[in-house]
Design a protein with these regions (language model features):
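C-terminal beta-signal and adjacent terminal beta-strands/loops
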Residues: 667, 729, 753-821
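Gram-negative outer-membrane beta-barrel transporters
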Residues: 449-450, 513, 517, 525-526, ...
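Extracytoplasmic beta-strand/coil segments of soluble accessory domains associated
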Residues: 165-212
Length: 821
């Protein structure tokens, strides 16, 4: 919905400072005003100084100005505007005695608003004329599906979260699990998919792709642990492959983190909690800059909630936005991160019940115990990105982005103990601990062009986009000895080079007032070059070099479309269909092969209802969907990564609601159901409910996030406060051999109080101190020792979830701005 900018109603001119000499040339002061929903000026900042005396005079006048507030439809909005004030030299002494200067009539030298608002005309001819630029956030583009969520984190940041990954829980149908430790990427469950650590969900950070091709731990591995939560302003979660801009790995959907720091000044936070957990964060937004300019540093360290769970990591993220002209801005972004962590891995349920683990015999010690202490990992990541945005005539836009990523990761895991090794004759098993390493560089370009076309007097959005990405990585897996941890066998060792070139076209039109159609197509090509460094030194024809080169090519096209019917001004019916794809893992390709890919076909239909666009609003959504994948992947304990199983299908539904009231109460709730099955041979594709249930994917997921903010007077001093609640409900997960896990119910709470620039907070995660299993499996293993006979019976394995965790936090807010009138 278009935004109407504020219009001046009363604008008395500033008074010429008495303590300055007569002017010989004009003096310009550029002010940034915050105009609230009532049209009052609530805050004034100097963007461009004309000297301290002139700054004070301009600010004193601005505080007396009144406006008709900006509006989106009929709802008044709080916005920021840039107002230039000119102090002109007088032509004669008589005029000088008046000691007044009016803002000069001129065009704004600042860029136009991101929402395309034009400078308003003066409300009355006798008022001084000046121009403004609305600096509000542009409205989110219309959703391509009911499951396309543009999520403002806002007040829900009060809910306890360990990392930015947990923000995904704000979207319906999302569950996270981590069996690898504090620093290992989370396993994402979305829309009935076990997306692993990213194989079926595309993850981006302001356009920079985070999925890693041919990763040793799994194709598409995406670690978001390096993202500083305080810097995440928005989250876009597109469930399903319905937007032409969605690329590789967007099988279950796409998640994009959008960064920004609304608050200016310094925010420093230090926390300490259970298990010696320590967290120190520092974020800074220069007062004279926009939310797109910030610096953030985050340090985390702790012993973990059990043996071999210690962790330590540090990260930095910085971004600046430069104005290159009235219509052009340049955004520079950089991030650097390093982490090291331990992992307890999985334990057998029978060993926990019988107290066989090498820990104290009490139930809690056994529950949080481990077998192999040589588990854990380390990770490093460095990102640089440059984005140039130009606004064109008629509301068009041209965006160009270049990025480079340097990445290194190493992990060690043991899922089966002593089962997979084929030792030399007469020797015992050496152990199944698997080391997976990944190191490489990614460079790429991304861009989009919106020409701003108008047909028959109506805007018809058309977007053209492209992506070019090149990965040069070394990926390897080795088996490690149980004693000493030395490698004794190489599982695979590949030097991989992958080039992905893609382009898409999307358009939107409204042939009828109540009907909006969207459509588009995406084309992707992949060129794979693999140097296999783990070939045998001898074959049937004799000795050979233990290396081999493989090259392959892949191509796929993905059409997508949706239709939106406006049943009432607030109620819409949206139906979407689309094809998506997941590229091949280069390690499994043959020379000169036309690289296969996993094709996903998905459809969704549902309703959306929204009331309010200002500080209070209520939004309801609900939909049903069906999805079919030509080649799915399921976790294999023998390799420690996902392996292909053939086609699969999903049938599901979800509902979500978000209620915001006057920046005091913010509640979001969702409930999702999905059934994932593997169809029987020859089964009809039109029966997505038939087939064998896929393991590890929960069928029912529920989530509630809520925050309440207020203020009170304590000892005649105003004190701000907030309380927050997070609740996750996870239904039973099917396991192999017709087994099911237990349901999980978790509650997290937090409370904060702020006096002036100091804030104290406390958070409690898993308030009820539940003993829950974060990941659960059912398979054959042998952890009794290298000489013990292996059992052929599958048994339950699990990784323990965190117990009750309490954390206290001290936060200090510094504005670093000179006090002005």
């Amino acid at each position: 919905m278009p935004v109407t900018p504020p219009v001046p109603v009363e604008a008395p001119p500033p008074v010429m400072p008495a303590d300055v000499p007569p002017l010989t040339e004009a003096v310009r002061v550029l002010l940034r005003l915050t105009i609230d929903a009532g049209g009052e000026v609530s805050q004034v900042e100097v963007r461009e100084s004309g000297g301290e005396a002139f700054d004070r005079a301009a600010m004193a006048a601005a505080l007396r100005w009144r406006f008709e507030p900006a509006r989106r439809g009929e709802e008044p909005l709080e916005v920021r505007v840039d107002v230039p004030v000119m102090f002109e030299p007088v032509a004669d002494a008589g005029a000088l005695a008046a000691n007044e200067a009016a803002p000069a009539e001129r065009s704004s030298s600042m860029p136009p608003a991101s929402m395309g608002a034009e400078p308003p005309a003066p409300a009355k001819p006798e008022l001084p004329v000046f121009s403004t630029t609305v600096r509000g956030q542009s409205a989110a583009p219309p959703p391509v599906a009911v499951g396309d969520f543009h999520i403002t984190v806002g007040q829900l940041a009060d809910v306890p979260r360990n990392s930015a990954t947990d923000l995904m829980l704000l979207a319906p149908g999302v569950m996270l699990a981590n069996h690898g430790g504090e620093g290992h990427a989370e396993t994402v469950y979305l829309r009935g998919f076990d997306a692993g650590e990213g194989k079926d969900v595309e993850i981006r950070l302001d356009g920079v792709p985070l999925n890693e091709v041919s990763q040793a731990h799994g194709h598409g591995y995406a670690d978001t642990y390096f993202i500083i939560p305080e810097l995440v302003q928005f989250l876009r979660v597109t469930e399903g492959p319905y937007d032409p801009s969605q690329g590789d790995f967007g099988v279950a959907g796409t998640v994009e983190y959008q960064l920004g720091l609304e608050r200016r000044g310094i925010t420093a936070s230090a926390s300490y909690g259970s298990f010696a957990s320590r967290r120190l964060s520092l974020v800074w937004g220069p007062p004279e800059s926009t939310a797109a300019t910030f610096v953030g540093v985050l340090l985390r360290q702790g012993h973990g909630f059990g043996p071999n769970r210690a962790y330590a990591n540090a990260g930095l993220m910085a971004q600046t936005e430069l104005r290159l002209g009235p219509e052009t801005k340049l955004r520079l972004f950089g991030a650097s991160y390093g982490a090291r962590y331990g992992s307890a891995g999985v334990v057998r349920e029978t060993d926990v019940v019988d107290s066989r683990l090498p820990c104290d015999a009490d139930a809690d010690s056994q529950f949080f115990c481990l077998y192999d202490p040589n588990q854990g990992g380390a990770s490093q990541r460095h990102i640089a990105s440059v984005e140039l945005t130009s606004r064109l005539e008629r509301g068009g836009r041209f965006v160009q982005q270049a990025f480079v990523i340097a990445r290194q990761m190493r992990s060690r895991e043991n899922f089966t103990g002593f089962l997979q090794d084929t030792p030399p004759i007469g020797e015992a098993q050496r152990g199944d601990n698997t080391e997976q390493s990944y190191q490489g560089t990614t460079v790429g370009l991304r861009g989009r062009y919106t020409p701003g076309l108008t047909w028959w007097g109506q805007p018809q959005p058309v977007e053209l986009g492209y992506v070019a990405r090149y990965d040069n990585v070394h990926t390897r897996a080795r088996r490690l000895r149980d004693k000493g941890g030395a490698p004794y066998a190489t599982v695979f060792d590949n030097q991989v080079r992958v080039t992905n070139l893609g382009a898409y076209l999307s358009l939107r039109g409204a042939p009828l007032e109540w009907l909006t159609l969207r459509g588009g197509v995406r084309v992707d090509t992949f060129l794979f070059g693999v140097e296999d460094l783990n070939r045998p030194a001898e074959d049937r024809q004799g000795a050979r070099i233990p290396e081999e080169s493989v090259e392959a090519y892949g191509f796929f096209a993905s059409p997508r479309a949706s239709a939106e019917v406006r049943l009432t001004p607030r109620l819409t019916w949206l139906t979407s269909v689309g094809l998506g794809a997941r590229s091949s893992d280069a390690a499994g390709l043959s020379d000169a092969e036309f690289a296969p890919y996993a094709r996903v076909t998905s459809g969704e239909t549902g309703l959306g209802w929204r009331w309010g666009d200002g500080p209070s609003m209520l939004e309801l959504r609900g939909a049903v969907f069906a999805t079919r994948v030509s080649q799915d992947l399921v976790f294999s304990e023998t390799t420690g990564r996902n392996q292909p199983i053939g086609p699969s299908q999903r049938l599901g539904a979800f509902g979500s609601a978000r209620f915001q009231w006057d920046q005091r109460l913010d509640v979001q709730a969702s409930l999702a159901w999905a059934r994932a099955t593997q169809p029987l041979p020859g089964a009809s594709p039109w029966k997505p409910w038939d087939g064998t249930v896929l393991p590890y994917i929960p069928q029912v997921l529920g989530r509630v996030d809520a925050s309440w903010r207020g203020s009170a007077t304590v000892a005649r001093q105003p004190v701000g406060w907030s309380v927050a609640l997070g609740h996750s409900a996870i239904g039973p997960k099917p396991l192999p051999l017709d087994r099911y896990s237990e349901s999980i119910f978790l509650f997290d709470v937090a409370a904060r109080a702020r006096w002036r620039s100091v804030e104290l907070g406390v958070s409690v995660e898993n308030v009820l101190d539940a003993r829950w299993r974060e990941s659960e499996f059912n398979y054959v293993s042998n952890f009794r020792g290298p000489d013990a006979p292996a059992s052929l019976l599958a048994t339950r394995h699990f990784s323990a979830g965190a117990p009750r965790t309490v954390r206290g936090t001290l936060t200090v807010y510094l504005d670093l701005q000179e006090e002005r009138p």
